[in-house]
Amino acid sequence: MTRRLLVAAAALALAACASTPQMQMPPDIAAKVKAIGPVIDPPKTAAIYAPLQPKEPYAGVRVTRDLRYGPDPRQALDVFAPDRVVSNAPVLMFVHGGAFVAGNKRGPGSPFYDNIMLAAARNGMVGVNMTYRLAPQHKWPTGAADVGAAVKWVQDYIRAHGGDPARVTLMGHSAGAVHVASYVAFPEHHRAGIGIARAVLVSGLFDFTKLTPPGKPEAAYFGGLAGTAQVSSLAGLLKTSVPLMVAYGEIDPPMFIEQAKLLNEALCAQGRCPRLVYLPGHSHMSEVYAVNTDDRSLSGPVLEFAR
């Protein structure tokens, strides 16, 4: 009996190992990302991943563009849903990055960040891809306020697209992760109800007191509050009951790695560890540009978490 158990365990381990390469970054792509290094370089990283992404029109997916959740031109969102009729499907909302001063849900001729929505829709979910107002014209806490307005739109209207407003996962990357974290951490943004079931924070910043002196992007968005606890989400994240996933790349700039570990350790110290996702070989941009390719390093855990 013992021998049979050992053989079965070995077979399971071998099967798990065999499936791992399909989930991870291919070696040729890994070499290109590594050559860019621990810097934030969207154009060079996009040149690696854009050829791997599908082009419009997207088969099997229904896309509704530029729905308004507020009066500003940047208060807009796209909804992706499976072409087949769905109801009460889980919802994945995505908030892009851009150093608080740039970025969009979608660029002309670019597959990003449609790729994240396609991964959601092709896995039976409804995707919501939002953009928001930018610094320096719009300072803290505008980003979190816009996230809150978009969440309210989802609560009001997502059923018409087949989504379940009770099963919303809110995902942010880089500056978008800061806005998502701020929305979750500061109750003033969700006094009528938080409107999400869980949150995913990919390469975000949570304790700005550790980032001194503040960088130009932080100064542009936070103004005189840059570098203070007042704009840091850490304390609020330690109090929230929202389940969290925290992700970061091996080749992320050091401050993002440090902040992910800081948040993870602080939550674990309270006995409520987040789902921590370490992305071997990935950089700040490759981690999100790889979504909807054969590399499921990030998309696999996120889609599982969001169901």
Language-model features: locations:
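Alpha/beta-hydrolase superfamily serine-hydrolase fold, recognizing
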Residues: 17-307
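Bacterial N-terminal signal peptides
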Residues: 7-15
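Bacterial N-terminal signal peptides that target proteins for export
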Residues: 1-6
